[in-house]
Design a protein with these regions (language model features):
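Short, hydrophobic/aromatic-rich segments at coil-to-beta transitions
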Residues: 55-57, 87-92
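Structural motif
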Residues: 75-76, 90
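Short coil-to-beta-strand transition motifs
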Residues: 96-101, 131-132
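Catalytic Cys-His active-site segments of thiol-dependent hydrolases/isopeptidases
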Residues: 113-119
Length: 146
């Protein structure tokens, strides 16, 4: 999976925070709350919610289908944190043999691999490739077609 664009994270001014009602729900329920239901209004700042360390965060837009099994699809926007130490199971953005890629870091039989979330792509053994980790994916922003 390669990239289209890398965007630096910049704090969003508080004036751009959007109001949202505090509504608690369960997965599987959909719809709107009763208009008569009391709720407390709050402000939601997506930058505050998604970006934990602004100085170490960047965004990258995904192209390709290699990570679909992990819920990362073509066109998704990834929030990547450079300050997180990579561990097995993390989704990484890495420079692999001169190409930017997004893969899941795994240890298989004591050897490090970068793995796709699509069975069409074989795991990549890191002992055979030059690899530089750029960061760990913290969040995925996925837009549904409307």
């Amino acid at each position: 999976m390669s990239h289209d664009t890398i965007f630096a994270a910049a704090p969003v001014p508080p004036s751009l925070a959007l109001p949202y009602p505090l509504i608690l729900g369960r997965a599987g329920l959909a719809g709107f709350p009763s208009p008569a239901q009391d709720y407390e209004g709050r402000l939601l700042d997506l930058n505050e919610h998604l970006v934990k360390r602004p100085a170490a965060t960047f965004f990258i837009k995904v192209t390709g289908d290699s990570m679909e099994g992990f819920g990362i699809h073509d066109g998704d926007l990834l929030v990547v944190d450079r300050s997180i130490e990579p561990r097995p199971g993390h989704i990484l953005v890495a420079m692999l043999e001169g190409e930017l890629t997004v893969k899941r870091y795994a240890i298989i039989d004591t050897h490090p691999f970068l793995c796709s979330g699509n069975p069409r792509y074989a795991p990549i053994p890191l002992v055979q490739h030059e690899c530089q980790v750029w960061g760990v994916v913290r969040s995925v922003i996925h837009e549904y077609p409307v």
